[in-house]
Design a protein with these regions (language model features):
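Phosphate/nucleotide-binding beta-alpha loop and adjacent structural elements of enzyme active sites
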Residues: 1-187
């Protein structure tokens, strides 16, 4: 990313309050399940994952709006139950956003994590509509949801079949980007 001046990397977490938080580290899954929230039902679905606070990692938390990003129209969020806090810290960003791809839950996988209905309700305030949800498995209570701004709804009809095929694949991000912004170089 060093050669691309359009990409900036910040070594912080995102949330709704600027402070420092300690992370519950996942020791067995390449840290994919690490979270600022204490694991709850997550342990029922992945009993092999061990979480610890013994190896404490304190992470500085910033609000997305603190970065004053004005030229992005897509937001992707997968932060292990902290999704609603990231959204609340990015309300100004969300107002200018066209699409949000976010991990959602049907159960409380981490203590205090939002239910998909909480995400729906919050994003409705910004005129977003959930247009696609892909659960990992019928028996697994998490997945990914795609939200589009209400004024993009006519666009949905043309893409609805395509989204069903692309969501949860590595091609989805490129697919969305190619429809919403002009990509000059291959990713």
């Amino acid at each position: 990313f060093q050669k691309n001046n359009l990409i900036k990397i910040f070594n912080t977490g995102l949330g709704d309050v600027e402070n420092n938080l300690t992370m519950y580290k996942d020791l067995n899954n390449d840290s994919q399940s690490s979270s600022f929230l204490k694991p709850k039902d997550h342990l029922k679905y992945h009993s092999y994952i061990n979480f610890t606070l013994d190896e404490k990692e304190v992470i500085p938390i910033m609000k997305l709006d603190s970065y004053k990003i004005n030229n992005a129209n897509i937001l992707c969020v997968d932060v292990q139950g902290f999704e609603l806090k990231v959204l609340k810290g990015g309300e100004r960003f969300i107002e200018n956003c066209d699409a949000i791809l976010i991990e959602v839950n049907r159960k409380e996988l981490y203590e205090g994590c939002p239910h998909i209905n909480d995400i729906d309700k919050f994003l409705k305030n910004f005129e977003f509509i959930r247009v696609s949800t892909k659960w990992w498995k019928q028996t697994i209570p998490w997945g990914d949801a795609l939200y589009l701004k209400k004024n993009k709804v006519p666009f949905i009809n043309r893409l609805s079949l395509v989204f069903k095929n692309y969501i949860n694949t590595k091609n989805l991000t490129f697919f969305i980007l190619s429809r919403f912004i002009n990509i000059k170089n291959k990713i």
